[in-house]
Every structure is written in C-alpha cells, then in structure tokens.
Swiss-Prot record:
Residues 1-38 form the signal peptide. The gene is TNFRSF14. It comes from the Eukaryota. This is Tumor necrosis factor receptor superfamily member 14. It comes from Homo sapiens. PROSITE patterns: TNFR_NGFR_1 (PS00652), TNFR_NGFR_2 (PS50050). Disulfide bonds join C42-C53, C54-C67, C57-C75, C78-C93, C96-C111, C99-C119, C121-C138, C127-C135.
Amino acid sequence: MEPPGDWGPPPWRSTPKTDVLRLVLYLTFLGAPCYAPALPSCKEDEYPVGSECCPKCSPGYRVKEACGELTGTVCEPCPPGTYIAHLNGLSKCLQCQMCDPAMGLRASRNCSRTENAVCGCSPGHFCIVQDGDHCAACRAYATSSPGQRVQKGGTESQDTLCQNCPPGTFSPNGTLEECQHQTKCSWLVTKAGAGTSSSHWVWWFLSGSLVIVIVCSTVGLIICVKRRKPRGDVVKVIVSVQRKRQEAEGEATVIEALQAPPDVTTVAVEETIPSFTGRSPNH
C-alpha cells in the first residue's frame, strides 16, 4: 500500500534553509574583532596629523598649516577676542569669556591671546553662580528696610546681612550699622505710643514745627529791621550833615572875626606937666 501522494516528510526532520545560513554568517562577522589603523605615538609638544607627528603651536597661536615632509607647522596669532592658553594643534582659537554688565558682571581680568577673561561682580553685587575661577551671574546687595540695621556688609560672595533693631531703638532708613536710641521727650509732649524701630516719637513733629515757627519769626523780624534800617540811616545822615554845616559856619565866623581889622578909636593923649610956680607946697 502506497502512502497518499500529499504526505511529506515527518515534521521532526530538519531541512537546511537559506535563512539559517545567512544568520550563521551574520553572527560570524559580528563577532569578528574590528581593527582600526593605530595613531602614531607623538611627543608631548607634537600632535598627530594622519600617520605623522607635527610640532604644536605656542600659547596664543593657532595652526595655520600643518607640517609636511620638509616643512614644519605654520602658526599664526589668535585674533582679538580669542585665546589659547597652552601648546596646541588647534586650527581655531577659543572665544573669550564675555562679562555682561546686565548680569552685574565686570572683567576682573581682561582677555588676552594667552589667557581667558575672568569675570567678577560689579561694586554693590555678590556672586550667585560660580563657574570655576570666575562668576557667571551676580545679584545686587539687599537693602535693609527702615527699622533694620546693617549687621554685616556685603562681599563679592555674600549678600548684606540685615537685623531688626531691638526695642527702644530705631533706624530711619536702614543704612546704619547701629540702631539709635529713642529720645525721651516727656518735658515737651506726652508719648503718643510706643516707639517703633523705624519711627521716632511724636515730639519730633511737634518740635520740628516749633523750630519752623521760630525760624520764620526770626526771618520776618530780620526783614522788618532791614526795611526800617535805611530810614534811620537817612535821618542820621541828615542830622550829621546839618551838624557839619553848623560847625562849618561857626568856624567860618571865627575866621572872619580873626581876619577883620580891629575897630580901635584913637584918642590924643596930652601930656600935662603940673605947674608949681608961685605956689608953696603948703597950698
């Protein structure tokens, strides 16, 4: 008896297939080690170019043209705004660090061909983002509020430290290092309330008003005196002129009297001689 024509080989019998062969080949090539061309071993002051070693450029210079069999490396200086700090085989120089004033930064060391710029904080700012040896961002110092004192001033790395004034003291604008003691003024006015650390007693207002009144009164008095003073001066001048005129007239009268010829009446004097002739002394 012959088996039916549609019967095939048993299912457990394996037949080679093309996909299996492809998988084996793929795994074989995948596991094979890959070999890359080895780079030449160059000295510390050289850099590899293909299979050759070329001399490096000095700090502040970049490679313009690599070396050849008969020529050395051609180097040229870094352009402004760029730098290279070490021996190198770079074809481009590095860009200098920019210190942005909008971030509160300033250059504490300017950039050169051999050194990068170092940024620090502008006056009144402290660093909030440190990046290596330079600062990347700064912030303005905090301002103490009225009623606070400056406990510790800000530095380039630390903000200003503020502290509230203790009871019985005050700070009007927050810029003082030590709070001021509140003044007792019971002789002038009763205290309206407990003094706060940022405001003083009410007597400041009253005493200030009193001072203003006194100053205004003094100024008004001075103005009145100055306005009246010219009239008094005029009277004094008139009196002085009259007095001088009278003195002058008196002196003129005296001079005229002295210079006028004397009013003398000449009287003839007759000399008489007593006659004793014919008379005796007894008569």
